Amino acid sequence: MSDSSKEKKKKFADMVSRQKGDDQQSDNHKQTDDLNEDLNTLKERAVQLEDHLRRAVADNENVKRIMQKQISDASDYAVTKLARDMIDSCDNLKRVMEILKDGDPVHEGIKVAYQKIINDLKKHGIKEVDPLGELFDSNLHQAVVEREDNEKEPGTIVEVLQTGYTIKNRLLRPAMVILSKKSADCGND
């Protein structure tokens, strides 16, 4: 074999080798592009899953907080029905004390029993609402009638007919009240 044919064979082999290298490089680029695309898809999916996880954890915390509030409220307000019955009994004891004379031993006994019940109610978060002299608040009071009184601002509570009660800052029973109003002839002086 001559040098020129050896040289031609070598050039041909180099060309084939380069062609194979180009094909292999092209295949490598295609595989790299495919892998990058797969990687980006997986990254997007990971971001979505992380977002779903965050939302699920937040929802779980909200449900937990709501349940704790409901349990707390159930505990705080479980005595509501009993409390309503007890305040009716307190009203009856008050009426009896108003009828009996102050020095009467029965009056004193009822007064002690009444005070004991009121103190026990307070231990459970039940408080009296005695708004005498305050301005009317429809959230806490129930107006029964208006009475002419030019000395007080209209809407001022001048008499409490029935004491109101709250349980842990929630209205149990509104106070029944009489409100002041200006007399009709007040402006005709």
UniProtKB/Swiss-Prot annotation:
Signal sequence annotation: none
Function summary: Participates actively in the response to hyperosmotic and heat shock by preventing the aggregation of stress-denatured proteins, in association with DnaK and GrpE. It is the nucleotide exchange factor for DnaK and may function as a thermosensor. Unfolded proteins bind initially to DnaJ; upon interaction with the DnaJ-bound protein, DnaK hydrolyzes its bound ATP, resulting in the formation of a stable complex. GrpE releases ADP from DnaK; ATP binding to DnaK triggers the release of the substrate protein, thus completing the reaction cycle.
Native species: Wolbachia pipientis wMel
GO cellular component: cytoplasm
Keyword Transferase tagged: no
Top-level taxon of origin: Bacteria
Annotated keywords: Chaperone, Cytoplasm, Stress response
Subunit structure as annotated in this protein's UniProt entry: Homodimer.
InterPro entries: GrpE (IPR000740), GrpE_coiled_coil (IPR013805), GrpE_head (IPR009012)
The name this protein goes by in its record: Protein GrpE
